[in-house]
Amino acid sequence: MTDPLVSIVTPSFNQAEFLAETITSVLNQSYPRIEYIIVDGSSNDGSVEIIKQYQDQIAWWVSEKDQGQTDAINKGFQQATGDIFAWLNSDDRYHPQAVSEAVQFFIENPDVGLVYGDVNLINHQGKGLGQFNAKETNYQKLRRGRVHIPQQAAFWRADLWKEVGPLDPAMFFAMDYDLWVRLAKISPIHYYAGHIWADFRIHGQSKTITADDKCWADMLQIHRRDGGSWFSILVAKYWIRKMIGPFWRWYKNRNYFDFIL
């Protein structure tokens, strides 16, 4: 694989406040061969006008009603023609070298199907909150709920998507975890330690804040689908989070507002 084309999909819905940062972080990559696709869910906050400002540099985009984030991502990858796939949400942003380093890794490691790096955590205004260091994982660890893969910093081979895709439309919160499990089941995956590839924005409307409990319910469903035991670590984590969930959400929200004040 020489100079592969990288297809990046951004699902967008009413996040105009962050969208230009997301778009420019893709367009300003040091790697030149990028096919950028944006799928907007009929936003009414000015997002479409922002997309139009960059449309000459976007391979394909659409703004129409959809069934949510998962549907938008699937729709985007239906249009993708690249050798390597990734998606970047409309409130996150890449670091300039991310795609180039991922491509080089794939060239040097033809047996690996998914590679991921680290991310910085940022707040609503883009101020740094710290760093999330991923960890090496595999199919068995993923099934036990040890995810450790930041979606913003993950890239995978397009030919594997053809085997395991699309994303499950029933998954609204843990569609990325579901994809990692399916990819890890058929291909080696690798953590590229020490390489920060993206900024993960934590804000009041992000799913990390608002829907952590729903994400774990999705993960439990995936675990059971793949034959997981009711006595596994993942199930224990699910029930612990369910019991302490109200306090945990209050604590996260309190700390989130401490960060932005």
Q: What positions do the PLM features span?
A:
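Conserved nucleotide-sugar donor-binding catalytic segment
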Residues: I8, F132-I222
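A conserved acidic beta->alpha catalytic loop
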Residues: P32, D40-E49, N89
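Conserved donor NDP-sugar-binding/catalytic core segment of glycosyltransferases
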Residues: R93, Q97-L129
